[in-house]
Amino acid sequence: MTPAPKSSFVLGHRHLLGIEGLSAADISGLLDLSEEYVELNRQVDKKRTSLRGRTQVNLFFEASTRTQSSFEIAGKRLGADVMNMSVSSSSMRKGETLMDTAVTLNAMHPDILVVRHHASGAVELLARKVDGSVINAGDGAHEHPTQALLDALTIRRNKGRIEGLTVAICGDVMHSRVARSNILLLGIMGARVRVVAPSTLLPPGIERMGVEVARDMREGLNGADIVMMLRLQRERMNGSFVPSSQEYFQYFGLDQKKLAYANPDALVMHPGPMNRGVEIDSAVADGAQSLIREQVEMGVAVRMAVLEALARNLPNA
């Protein structure tokens, strides 16, 4: 059994529905606790008992590999009883509403619900109907808070800070919940954020979020410390937003030539899954400046920290 983390941080919120509403102190506290779990997860014995006796339900209405498996591993390492609910075989496939599903699950007294849904705002609605804590694992194009937290942890571990860095977020900003959560978090933590995309993939009024806007990669990557690539979210697109994948890669795909526009020590990130040859070239994704595999490792640590920080607020904790 691994030793308990030294951090006693408690998240002062019942749920984690988004980055919006978190303070810099909340974010720093979660990142500090996550740092401890990074080291604990590298030990042979990774088990903890902080969620022993607690029930964690992973309720995913959208397909997921990284996020769902990461939350499952995180919960089990903390000692929780983890249940993955298959929506394909659930009552919702038979016509039950989201709210009825929430009421039904609540009657089983889960302590923590981890929810992903294709509709923006659906997770917040569900949270109103349950007694336990709810973690948003991604809702439509709205938010994906744990992805932004793991990205922040990855940046902080490699750059030593977040404040003052220039972060270029490139690609399908319009349909990306990852972009929105990262813009919010990086702004709270004092980074300079620039979004880089063709006009068709920029949400109207994005400047109101306090970001700079660039419509070509040379301008967008100039002076960047971090280059964060986003995939084309075709499942959320109604119509054509780019002429073709090949033309998109020509102008907005990250290859070695375009990466040279950024600072020499710039680092590359991607939330996954990647579309190689569309938004990123394999030579960059697998190259020395890539943090993409490290992001996956940080995901487990961050989700353990979030689960523990919320569990410390639960009754009888």
Curated annotation (Swiss-Prot):
Pathways per UniProt: Pyrimidine metabolism; UMP biosynthesis via de novo pathway; (S)-dihydroorotate from bicarbonate: step 2/3
Annotated positions binding carbamoyl phosphate: R66, T67, R116, H144, Q147, G272, P273
Keyword rRNA processing: no
Example of a GO MF term: aspartate carbamoyltransferase activity
Enzyme Commission number, as recorded: 2.1.3.2
Residues annotated as signal peptide: none
Keywords: Pyrimidine biosynthesis, Transferase
Top-rank taxon, per record: Bacteria
Function: Catalyzes the condensation of carbamoyl phosphate and aspartate to form carbamoyl aspartate and inorganic phosphate, the committed step in the de novo pyrimidine nucleotide biosynthesis pathway.
Subunit structure: Heterododecamer (2C3:3R2) of six catalytic PyrB chains organized as two trimers (C3), and six regulatory PyrI chains organized as three dimers (R2).
Protein name: Aspartate carbamoyltransferase catalytic subunit
Organism whose genome encodes this protein: Rhodopseudomonas palustris (strain BisA53)
Lineage: Bacteria, Pseudomonadati, Pseudomonadota, Alphaproteobacteria, Hyphomicrobiales
Gene of this entry: pyrB
